[in-house]
A protein has these predicted regions:
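A short glycine-rich, Lys/Arg-flanked "PGG" loop and its adjoining helix->strand segment in the class I
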Residues: 164-176
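Conserved beta-strand signature within the Rossmann-like core of class I S-adenosyl-L-methionine
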Residues: 177-185
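Class I SAM-dependent methyltransferase Rossmann-like catalytic core
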Residues: 30-66
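Conserved SAM-binding loop of SAM-dependent methyltransferases across substrates and taxa
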Residues: 83-95
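A short acidic, Gly/Pro-enriched loop at the edge of an enzyme's catalytic core
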Residues: 139-150
Length: 223
């Protein structure tokens, strides 16, 4: 995950932070401990929490539009999971889903990143039995199953021109009926969109109301 300096988090339109920006531990005994999802590059702790509030709202909107029940037993992949924020958001929304989160856990854009910290976040929030974090990247990951939903946030732009190969690899982990929710800073029509539409049908484009640069969340389906 990599947030850049030109994201104007102070002007974001958000609701109460405890409603959107926080994930509440499902086990009351864990309330004395706090999850830590990191401070993004060129950001502060408070600003990063506001960014996550908006991201959670947008992905929750995307999940609500998919033809799945909240208690369906889904297989979800979080490609570039960082410290597990989006993995936990999906586990909170889809109550019986099993989530696999992959990351190198080495990117300098997210301070104190580690698989151990991601696992601890899931444990604190009560999702450790349904989230499995693996140290890998999209170019080396070889799953033995196909996924019902693939999620990713602010990952693919980091790959430069190699992102097109990454898009193709992502497509190989899907089956007919898979949905992809991908948030990123740019989706260029002649390159990114053209490549993605070879494999997926774009159903929706969700954007923040203002102040989030060129960020957009694409909701796509595999047919």
């Amino acid at each position: 995950m990599d947030f850049v300096a030109d994201i104007c988090v102070c002007s974001l339109s958000i609701r109460r932070m405890d409603e959107l920006g926080s994930l509440i531990p499902s086990n009351r005994r864990e309330k004395t401990k706090e999850s830590y999802f990191g401070t993004y590059h060129h950001s502060t702790s408070a600003a990063s929490k506001k960014v996550r509030a908006v991201v959670k709202a947008m992905f929750t909107d995307a999940f609500a539009s998919l033809p799945f029940g909240r208690h369906d037993e889904l297989r979800i992949l979080d490609a570039g999971c960082g410290l597990g924020f989006l993995s936990c958001v999906s586990a909170e929304f889809y109550k019986n889903a099993r989530i696999t989160g992959i990351d190198t856990f080495e990117h300098t854009s997210l301070k104190r990143s580690s698989a151990e910290r991601a696992k601890e976040n899931a444990r604190i929030l009560g999702f450790s039995d349904r989230i499995d974090f693996k140290k890998s990247d999209v170019f080396k990951f070889t799953p033995n199953e196909k996924f019902d939903i693939i999620i990713s946030n602010l990952v693919f732009h980091n790959f430069g021109k190699m992102r097109f190969e990454a898009y193709s690899r992502l497509s190989s982990w899907t089956h007919a009926g898979t949905f992809v929710a991908m948030g990123d800073l740019f989706f260029r029509p002649k390159t990114d969109i053209a490549h993605l539409t070879k494999a997926f049908k774009i159903m929706r484009e969700i954007k923040p109301k203002r102040g989030f640069g060129q960020y957009a969340l694409l909701v796509m389906s595999k047919e």
